[in-house]
Amino acid sequence: MNLQNPKDRKLVHNRNIHCMGYIRKDGDFDIEAVLTDSKTYDFPSDTHGIVKKNTPYHHMRVRITVDVNLRVKEAHAMTISGPYQICPKGAENFKNLIGIKIGPGWKRRVQERIGGPSGCTHITELTGPLATTAYQTIGGEISRQRRRGIEANNLPEINQENNLKNSCIAYSEAVSYTHLTLPTKRIV
C-alpha cells in the first residue's frame, strides 16, 4: 500500500534509522540503533572534500543495555562519520544515560543528560527509537518465552493494559479497546 500519488518529484536525501534488539545470555537486553544520512548527488564538504552520492555524511551507532525493568545498565555511542571534526566528541556523554529508566519522562531525562551543546543532535534523536525498540524486544521475548513454557527471566507480573492505556488511538480510553486481546503477563 502506498501513500496517495505524490506530485512529480526527485529523491535528493536519504535518512535511514535501523534498530535491533538482542537478548543476552545474562538475561539483559542490548538495543542498538544506527542512523545514516546521505545525498543522491556529490557535494562539497569543508572537512571531507567531495562527499560522493549515497555516501553517509552522518553515520552514528548507539547501544544501550537494559534489564527487564528497562533500566539502562550500559550505554555506548560512536560517530563513524560526521560533517565536522568535533562531531565524534558529541558521543562521549552518552554514558550519562546509565541508571535511568525507559518510561514516562524518558525524553526529558535524555535531553537533560546528553542533549544540548555538549551532545550530538542525531545521537540524541536515536534514543526515541531505542526506547520503542526496547519495549518491542523485551515484550516480544517475554511473550515468546511464555508461549514456549519458559520462565521469562523471572519477570514480575505486569499488566499490559495499564502500560498502554492512552498511548495511541488503538489503546485510547475514548475508543473502547476491548476489541484487543491483551496478554496480562507482558511488559509491552
Give the role of each language-model region.
Residues 1-23, 32-33:
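N-terminal "first-domain core" detector
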Residues 178-184:
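Conserved small/polar residues in nucleotide/adenosyl-binding loops
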Residues 14, 21-23, 35-177:
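Active-site- and interface-proximal helix/loop "cap" or "latch" segments in soluble metabolic
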